[in-house]
Amino acid sequence: MAATLLDVCAVVPAAGFGRRMQTECPKQYLSIGNKTILEHSVHALLAHPRVTRVVIAISPGDSRFAELPLAQHPQVTVVDGGDERADSVLAGLRAAGDAQWVLVHDAARPCLHQDDLARLLSLSETSRTGGILAAPVRDTMKRAEPGKAAIAHTVERTDLWHALTPQFFPRELLHDCLSRALNEGATITDEASALEYCGFHPQLVEGRADNIKVTRPEDLALAEFYLTRTI
């Protein structure tokens, strides 16, 4: 079977709360239009024909997910997530069956464009390690003095990228790297960092900068603008 026809399973870690949003409702359950942020994020994945299944890792005490139409979607599976993102991703990988390649996507990143997703998925034809959507840094970057709100120095932005999601890897490779990194006490901030820890160098696939993660209150209005405009 050609690599371009291989089915892909997506894992969405959605067990976090997101305290920076300053709401009692977890950010993934805030609404934009008639859908929650989580629903926008998941439907963007399922819109691609290669993504045949999505595993969502939620908090064991989550009572909101069952109320969503998404809970009855035939291509959606739900598992209990963990205390940390990496634990939730591992739980999702264990439920991914025999999928050779997996996407991992933030629950609160609802503005994914199909062109970006298609270019990321094409890595299964050319790469053995996969890669991530990312955006080149365009702003001037400053390093702060340790523990102070004062500039230590300007950071050279050449070759700096903002890591986005989805991130796309062979399932077994990601599982092994995440497991090893956690067992050895490494700091894992995203899935690519687990592969980096194990000596791999995932590819950077340039994506649109409007593929934002809803993290702070002002992000909600921006995401709504991006989702409702026609481009």
From Swiss-Prot:
It catalyses: 2-C-methyl-D-erythritol 4-phosphate + CTP + H(+) = 4-CDP-2-C-methyl-D-erythritol + diphosphate. PROSITE patterns: ISPD. The record marks R20, K27 as: Transition state stabilizer. Its EC number is 2.7.7.60. SUPFAM superfamilies: Nucleotide-diphospho-sugar transferases (SSF53448). It comes from the Bacteria. Homodimer. PANTHER family: 2-C-METHYL-D-ERYTHRITOL 4-PHOSPHATE CYTIDYLYLTRANSFERASE, CHLOROPLASTIC. This is 2-C-methyl-D-erythritol 4-phosphate cytidylyltransferase. It comes from Citrobacter koseri (strain ATCC BAA-895 / CDC 4225-83 / SGSC4696).
